[in-house]
């Protein structure tokens, strides 16, 4: 998350613009994006291996956003690719299914996209507007939100 009042204002203002752009870009119903930003680990790693083990890559394109794509060459096969954060915007816009672990983008999904937040330790109070000191920000950036019980 972006630290600092003015940085956060700029971040969310940019997100509003990109959210409007996102509405106009066609979605690929056969594309799954796993957004990690750092290494493929925890929930993202588990989801990735589950999808590959069960053959989802035969029907869907699976794109993983990681910090060092070259570390995952052994997992690359047809319809599976690893990309950097810098090259991820197009895939974020076009994927119907986006899974986020440990990061919240200021871009909102369209009605034609499903975005899942599957952090462990999800900050539910912040996301559900229960912490008023955060200001007038809209934190509803996911279609679904998971939480451990």
Language model: regions and residue ranges:
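Active-site and donor-binding regions of nucleotide-sugar-utilizing enzymes
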Residues: 33-149
């Amino acid at each position: 998350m972006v630290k600092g009042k003015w940085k956060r204002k700029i971040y969310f203002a940019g997100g509003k613009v990109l959210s409007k752009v996102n509405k106009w870009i066609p979605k690929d119903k056969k594309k799954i994006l796993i957004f990690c930003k750092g290494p493929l680990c925890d929930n993202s790693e588990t989801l990735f291996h589950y999808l590959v083990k069960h053959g989802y890559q035969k029907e869907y394109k699976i794109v993983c956003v990681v910090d060092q794509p070259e570390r995952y060459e052994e997992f690359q096969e047809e319809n599976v690719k690893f990309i950097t954060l810098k090259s991820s915007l197009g895939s974020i816009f076009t994927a119907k299914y986006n899974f986020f672990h440990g990061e919240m983008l200021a871009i909102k999904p369209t009605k034609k996209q499903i975005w899942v937040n599957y952090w462990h330790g999800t900050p539910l109070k912040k996301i559900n507007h229960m912490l008023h000191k955060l200001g007038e920000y809209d934190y509803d950036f996911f279609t679904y939100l998971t939480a451990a019980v």
